Amino acid sequence: MFQGLWLSQREFELEPIAMDVDHTNDLVRQHHEGNEAWFSRCDHYRYDLRWRAQEGGDFEAEECIFLMLNPSTADAFKLDPTNRRCFDFTKRERAKYMYVLNIFAYRATDPRDMKSQDDPIGPENDRLIRRWHQRAKETAARYICA
């Protein structure tokens, strides 16, 4: 459960993480230095992840949008190994942002853990995937299913 101020996961660092709560949809936004992640208030679901890949204004694309199976440990402060590879791809493609969506929003380091969940998709996930799909059609985004 999210309570109070979240602290950075970086060792020895006690930097507060900015958080906003969307009471309409019961979502929590974690953000830091241009990076952002949206979670369920219970922290069991991560709905999307955005990391700034490039500074300046010379981009081939505004964003690379990745649609993957399920989120693991990545957040606005740190990337897990899979998202690190996506981030590196985004930089090579000269896109400004990496966005990560997941078919299942339930956070698990082992996808088999989702089988025991009543709702591995998450209550807000389908709506957000539709929103990002529409955005990809309207912009010069690269849409990657991995």
Regions found by a protein language model. Name each.
Residues 96-113:
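Short connector loops at secondary-structure junctions
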